[in-house]
Amino acid sequence: MIYELFYPLKFHYGWLSWLNVLRYIPFRTIMATITAMVLTFVLAPWFIRELRRKQIGQVVRAEGPETHKIKAGTPTMGGALILLSLLLPTVLWADLRNPFVLATTAVTAGYGVIGYLDDFLKIKRRNSGGLPGRYKLIGQVLIGGAAVAYTFLLASKLPPDWAEIRTRLAIPFVAFSKYPIELPLYVYIPFAVFVVVATSNAVNLTDGLDGLAIGPVIINAGTYLILAYIVGASIASFSLATYLDIPAIASAGELSVYCGSVIGAGIGFLWYNTYPAQVFMGDVGSLALGGGLGMLAVFTKNELLSIILGGIFFIETVSVITQVLSFKLTGKRVFLMAPIHHHYEKKGWAEPKIIVRFWIISILLALVSLASMKLR
């Protein structure tokens, strides 16, 4: 919004030539990060007090770890604050004419609404049931599908590079120009929606300990910021993406501003969500943030790399699937409890140890993901 409103003024008033800085994505990304962080820090104390006053507290599962019983009543739905602190800076600093930005923010907001309904029902009923899974999944598929289809229908209005590679998959550590996976449009769109929905639910499953989910979300957003900028960056006629032999998508660079907003809001929230947490994000936060990460993977053509980058989320999801299948087929459990972070709790690991070690793994996976751009 600021870009569209103020940048044109420099052409009419010479003394406003300094507004030229708004052209640059790195500047607007930094400003979005700072704005999101400041918003979260300023609003969080009041927001947490209001959650306490309205008795919007965490409902703990009866079959959960014993150590979680003390968490009952801790303010939840803090993800609503993350959404506000994420979406407002994105609207302020990003180029809202960019379809990728519009689609990503729409999914973030839409998944946030689904998460809000889920949290609301949990609190109202005083149990961990929430919104029935089938309704949640239908909502995610419809919103994700609409956003993905929107960008594909507009392919002719986007730079030619997007129309050319939109249904191709980049294989990590493999030169994109030589060995892309070409999918038919009717196959790719459902696959892209699956990536978005799966990432959203994976982040939701990871959000079981204080700061466990938001840490990797920040790390993933920081990595996507770099990837989006490189994919969309072009200096004169030199394209860094072409040099690295990864997909080049000029419009994707604007997603860096969105990533900056996620990082800023995430850091601000982590200040209050770190162990012992003063507030939980709830499904309103985890589903929204996961949906946003899924859209980033699709629009930067890192659908397959997201398995490595979001390895923590992937492992958490696989642990749940493995546990359910094993119990149904054999009557035995592979883990003491799923998702896997609860398994380590049951083994006696201290909560901060689990959290920090998962963060470390997430950082290492982010470094591997970035290295994949050059190691081809």
Curated annotation (Swiss-Prot):
Its EC number is 2.7.8.13. Keywords: Cell cycle, Cell division, Cell inner membrane, Cell membrane, Cell shape, Cell wall biogenesis/degradation, Magnesium, Membrane, Metal-binding, Peptidoglycan synthesis, Transferase, Transmembrane, Transmembrane helix. It holds the Pfam family Glycos_transf_4. GO terms for molecular function: metal ion binding; phospho-N-acetylmuramoyl-pentapeptide-transferase activity; UDP-N-acetylmuramoyl-L-alanyl-D-glutamyl-meso-2,6-diaminopimelyl-D-alanyl-D-alanine:undecaprenyl-phosphate transferase activity. This is Phospho-N-acetylmuramoyl-pentapeptide-transferase. It is a multi-pass membrane protein. GO terms for biological process: cell division; cell wall organization; peptidoglycan biosynthetic process; regulation of cell shape. Pathway: Cell wall biogenesis; peptidoglycan biosynthesis. Belongs to the glycosyltransferase 4 family. MraY subfamily. Its cofactor is Mg(2+). The chain crosses the membrane at residues 28-48, 76-96, 100-120, 135-155, 179-199, 211-231, 252-272, 279-299, 307-327, 353-373.
